[in-house]
């Protein structure tokens, strides 16, 4: 409640200070066109009370019609419903520009989209794009999500803040977001997606920061994400529907970020992963999760794969668990689950974490929930320091490598295993060879 009140006060102060006199002209950094389109020239008021949806949409449309360029949002508070960006467009938010989501659900039209891993009818995002290329949202402004009735946000799903579908060459940089109720940023089926120097804040369950969904070539760089759910979640759909599409999330780099979750995890991989997740590197990040720092997860009936996950130079602080592996998790099931004694389980291999510092962590690794019918193949943990109460628990994993694990404060054994094969199992503290 305190966070919500403070957020409201900050928003009011921000709107009071963002008067037209403080307007700043920006040039496009997209390098595609020097055209510029000021939303005030299209009738936007920026007074925080008048709905500026139509005016801003006209500016965005004019940008596309004229071959691309920059849509300038000067200082002010712009109350808007859903708007759609097109190709070759930069949306430039002035430092004191605030986009405020309309509290009226009717301002977010119903469309088809993916929600919790399956296609369904959803409300269109506050800012969306589909099958667009070379789009950017830049600048030091802020985007505030709408305040809506939570009971009406699931069927159909309510609007997320930014949702980009089948887009290429996307840049999100420099702005901040705040939303109480749903995901903030959801790239779906995108290629060459970059999020840099963003400040993302959410509060409630389902308040994920960035949900990377069946995307490839992704960079999340120098972002500060503090959420009520997963700070970053990597997904690729669930069930046979996603397996048939065969569109994994792959080639993802997360670096130099602060990831904080007040309810779940700093980084979640799965459980919606039937299309596969591979080639993920997270490095030089500070992570604090209410349940887990990093959570690799799946369920029966998901199939798919998770492979080539690397974490290096991470600080995990105030988390019950540094790393949790739960591939038999219970919960929401796909409407068309993958069947077969072995095939129903995710294929997981090549998980590696090196040079990790843990502080005030209750359990180092919780890795016993792995199906015996499909063991993890390849798990490396080296160079772990800090303090924790409970050590490492592993089950049904082959090709394990443990070395240089030196933590203090243990109240039991450093390592407990069941059906585990590899090196360093007898002395995990020994230096790596």
Question: What residue spans do the PLM features occupy?
Answer:
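Positively charged n-region of N-terminal signal peptides that target proteins for export
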Residues: 1-4
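Bacterial N-terminal signal peptides
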Residues: 7-18
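Extracellular/periplasmic carbohydrate-active domains that bind, remodel
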Residues: 19-433
């Amino acid at each position: 409640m305190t966070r919500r009140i403070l957020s409201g006060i900050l928003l009011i102060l921000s709107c009071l200070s963002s008067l037209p006199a403080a307007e700043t002209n920006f040039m496009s950094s997209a390098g595609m066109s020097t055209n510029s389109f000021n939303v005030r020239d299209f009738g936007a008021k920026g007074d925080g009370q008048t709905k500026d949806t139509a005016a801003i949409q006209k500016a965005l449309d004019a940008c596309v019609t004229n071959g691309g360029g920059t849509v300038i949002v000067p200082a002010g508070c712009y109350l808007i419903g859903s708007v759609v960006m097109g190709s070759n467009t930069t949306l430039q938010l002035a430092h004191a520009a605030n986009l405020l989501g309309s509290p009226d659900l009717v301002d977010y039209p119903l469309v088809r989209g993916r929600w919790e891993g399956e296609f369904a009818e959803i409300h269109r995002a506050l800012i969306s794009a589909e099958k667009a290329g070379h789009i950017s949202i830049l600048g030091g402004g802020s985007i505030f999500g709408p305040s809506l009735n939570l009971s009406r946000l699931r069927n159909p799903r309510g609007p997320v803040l930014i949702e980009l579908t089948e887009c290429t060459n996307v840049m999100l940089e420099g702005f901040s977001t705040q939303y109480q109720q749903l995901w903030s940023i959801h790239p779906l089926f995108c290629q060459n997606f970059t999020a840099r120097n963003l400040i993302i804040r959410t509060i409630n369950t389902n308040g994920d920061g960035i949900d990377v969904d069946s995307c490839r070539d992704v960079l999340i760089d120098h972002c500060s994400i503090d959420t009520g759910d997963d700070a970053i979640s990597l997904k690729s759909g669930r069930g046979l529907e996603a397996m048939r599409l065969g569109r994994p999330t792959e080639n993802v780099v997360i670096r130099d970020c602060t990831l904080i979750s007040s309810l779940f995890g700093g980084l979640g991989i799965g459980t919606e992963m039937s299309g596969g997740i591979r080639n993920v590197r997270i490095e030089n990040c500070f992570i604090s999760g209410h349940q887990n720092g990093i959570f690799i997860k799946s369920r029966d009936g998901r199939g798919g794969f998770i492979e080539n996950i690397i974490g290096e130079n991470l600080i995990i602080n105030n988390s019950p668990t540094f790393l949790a592996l739960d591939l038999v998790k219970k919960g929401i099931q796909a409407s068309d689950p993958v069947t077969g004694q072995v095939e129903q389980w995710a294929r997981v291999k090549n998980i590696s974490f090196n040079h990790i510092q843990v502080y005030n962590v209750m359990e180092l690794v919780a890795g016993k929930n792995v199906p015996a019918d499909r063991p993890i193949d390849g798990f490396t943990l080296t160079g772990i320091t800090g303090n924790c109460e409970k050590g490492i628990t592993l089950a049904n994993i082959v090709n394990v490598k443990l070395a240089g694990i030196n933590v203090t404060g243990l109240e039991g054994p450093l390592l407990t295993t069941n059906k585990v094969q590899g090196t360093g199992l007898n002395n995990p503290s020994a230096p790596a060879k």
